[in-house]
Amino acid sequence: KNWPNFSKNLISNVGRILGSGKINYTDGPYGIKFEKEFSKFVGNRYSIAVCNGTAALEVAIKSLKLPKNSEIIVPARSFFASASCIVNTGYIPVFADVNLLTQNILIDDIKKKITKRTKAIICVHLAGLPCDMDSIKKLANKKKIKIIEDCSQAHGASINNKQVGSFGDISTWSFCNDKIMSTLGEGGMISTNKKNLYEFCKRYINHGTNYKNNKKTEKFIYNKDYFGTNLRITEIQSFAGLEQLKNLKKIQNKRENISKIYFDLISNYQDFFNYYYPSKKIKSAWYRLYFFLKTDIKNYQKIRFKIIKDLRKNNLKCFTGSCPEIYLEKAFKKLNNIRPIRLKNCKILGETSIALEINHTLEYSQHKKKLLILKQVIEKNFQI
């Protein structure tokens, strides 16, 4: 099966919701219910559903109301939107290096990048693996810096049974088509424990409307407290989100079990690859499974591309991985206030990483066939 894969219950209910005519967030019950259930799952007081994960990031930043020309520290290895959201909200991205194994933002490099203008840190839980939130929170509290958690790839990930997205000041998720949770192709969520941030986000994504003064009467109501925009999610998307949320723990357990059998194989080739498997206290969401060629291998970059090419020929979905150095994108080169020095670890990961898709809709027998292909491709390329 391909992912996303939607249940028969969801597919049948799409027709029912369409037939009801209540398809807009402001008319139906599912958007509000999705927000409440998501808050319960994460362990936060408030959540706001939006049209996509990028919108969620931009609104989250806006809610912090940072001073003009503020700097926001972000890992250089991530999806483009993790950094473009900073530019689109009028602030300055400062890129930090990442750990060579976890691929998450390095606390030591955050410390080096902090200036008087640093007002926030975006922690990206890349590939579903939680960042070192304890260390980051201690530093942020000491320096009075806000934390935004980008959980776009980390649905259900946790540290000591505490869900990612419940550590920072405000957090965001994406429900794009390839994510662990998908709301029919697009969707996003913002979550926080802070009422003032919730109030801003709730109003901003609906044209700045004061939702407490939004009753339908025969009179016209002036209820726009400030300028916002329309980033609402639909009722059908919200119903899909509720369906996915019900099954998230089951999905996550299956993804974890699948990842274990792949790592069992990769561990046989430690002369060629580095990899990271988290400790018991850290639960990854396993959005992608990463391993990295060792740089002391002759022609390691050529071998990497050959492995990826061979795996793809055999219908095993494989990638080089996340954008290794976002600041190399042409869009950032045009900005006068961005003059980054290339970051050592990000550069290395850009040359060594291999990412495998984890498809939890497949049976274990199908994964065993894929494992055999992976074994054959590795041994062929290293002439074992």
Residue ranges of each PLM-predicted region?
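N-terminal "arm"/small-domain region of PLP-dependent enzymes with the aminotransferase-like
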Residues: 1-23, 223-225, 357
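PLP-dependent aminotransferase class I/II
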Residues: 33-36, 44-47, 108, 120-124, ...
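Conserved active-site segment immediately N-terminal to the catalytic lysine
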Residues: 149-184, 213-215, 220-225
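PLP-dependent aminotransferase-like
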Residues: 62-142, 146-151, 158
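Phosphate-binding glycine-rich loop
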Residues: 23-71, 85-89, 95-97, 162
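Hydrophobic/aromatic ligand-binding patch that stacks against planar heteroaromatic rings
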Residues: 84-86, 139, 163, 180, ...
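Active-site PLP attachment segment
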Residues: 166-210, 235
